[in-house]
């Protein structure tokens, strides 16, 4: 994998998170769900070219500004783990989420969820969540993890690396 694609992932993700926080009206203690196909980010087909390096580049870019703003990250696993989510234990406890007994791996859970697990201080997997906003990288289908009502958010970024990306915020019904 070229350094060029990793640099693009970092640059695209940096712009995306900087724009999404204010555009989605995210505040400390709220949850951002991120679904990510590392395969799509590097130009492959979802589920076929898992890239731990691309996943690491993404999480290492997203996590610092989210933590600085007090926004809680929920990383969606792939379908092999029934789209469970990786969160910090404190997030699960605060929102009353019951942990499930799984640990993601690059080919069972996904490279992104694995990278998040490795970087969190006290990670747990939960079955479902109702996030305040979302970032879907590579058409991973995060809608099931958003609160009602989801509203599209348009940012200047339409791709993270080679993957299409869409963003959402939520509002009360």
Outline where the language-model segments fall.
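Structural motif
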Residues: 32-35, 166
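Glycine-rich, aromatic-bearing surface loops/beta-hairpins
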Residues: 114, 118-173
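Generic secondary-structure signature for well-ordered alpha-helical cores
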Residues: 18, 22-25, 63-71, 117-125, ...
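N-terminal glycine-/serine-/threonine-rich phosphate-binding loop
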Residues: 1-32, 52-65
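Short glycine-enriched, charge-decorated loop/helix-capping segments at active-site entrances
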Residues: 46-52
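Glycine-rich beta-strand-to-loop/alpha-helix junction loops that act as flexible
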Residues: 34-39, 76
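Solvent-exposed alpha-helices and their adjacent loops that cap or buttress functional pockets
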Residues: 24-26, 108, 154-159
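Ligand-binding beta-strand-loop-alpha-helix segment within the catalytic cores
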Residues: 69-132, 138
């Amino acid at each position: 994998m070229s350094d060029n694609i990793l640099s693009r992932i970092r640059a695209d993700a940096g712009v995306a998170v900087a724009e999404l926080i204010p555009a989605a009206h995210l505040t400390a203690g709220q949850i951002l769900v991120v679904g990510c196909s590392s395969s799509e980010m590097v130009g492959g087909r979802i589920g076929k070219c898992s890239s731990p390096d691309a996943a690491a580049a993404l999480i290492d870019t997203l996590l610092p500004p989210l933590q600085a703003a007090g926004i809680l990250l929920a990383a969606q696993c792939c379908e092999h783990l029934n789209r469970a989510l990786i969160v910090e234990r404190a997030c699960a406890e605060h929102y009353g989420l019951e942990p499930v007994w799984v640990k993601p791996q690059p080919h069972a859970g996904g490279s992104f969820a694995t990278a998040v697990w490795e970087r969190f201080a006290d990670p747990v997997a939960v079955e479902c969540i109702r996030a305040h906003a979302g970032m879907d990288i590579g058409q991973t289908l995060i809608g099931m993890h958003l609160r009602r009502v989801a509203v599209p958010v348009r940012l200047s970024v339409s791709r993270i690396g080679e993957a299409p990306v869409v963003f959402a915020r939520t509002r009360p019904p």
